Amino acid sequence: LLASTGDQALAAWLGRLQDASFSRAGAVRKAYPPERRMTGPQLAGYLARRTYALASSTRPDGRPHAAPTLFSIYAEAFWLPTLGSAARLGNVRAHPWLALSIIEGEHDTHAAVLTEGPAEVLAAVPADVRSITELRNRGGSLDWATDWLRMTPQRLFSFAELAWQGVSPSS
């Protein structure tokens, strides 16, 4: 459940997922040094605050596709409400994999979470997913969401510049 920074279960899961991802990573470990990675609680807080991600998928013909999307986290998966005519539905049906990029800031204050995993198209979702996502949509109705994507992350990486973390470079 994506509720607040205080959600210890979410923070623990995100921390474990990131640790496992970095333990299997190659060159990305150099690009994302340990002191620049978010902690589990930082990840939970960041993802609670950021309501939109850039979803990247592969079109049936192999070309890349990216589009912004509202997202929620529930039951260790990312949930994306989607219009029935959205290109990403056909993309995920053809290539059941999705990558999400959640970024903010510029230069010394930027932060990013990158996650990816298998995805599936669903016509219905648990009531909790719908209500959580409506809250994240500032109470806006999700009647337009005729389909949903559920992505179960296999990898998650984060990066946060020191200024984003509130740390001075000399500390």
Regions found by a protein language model. Give the residues of each.
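Short gly/pro-enriched beta-turn/loop segments at secondary-structure junctions
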Residues: 48-50, 64-66, 144-146, 152
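Short beta-strand segments
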Residues: 50-84, 100-102, 111-114
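Short, surface-exposed beta-strand-loop junctions and turns on beta-sheet-rich folds
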Residues: 86-88, 165-166
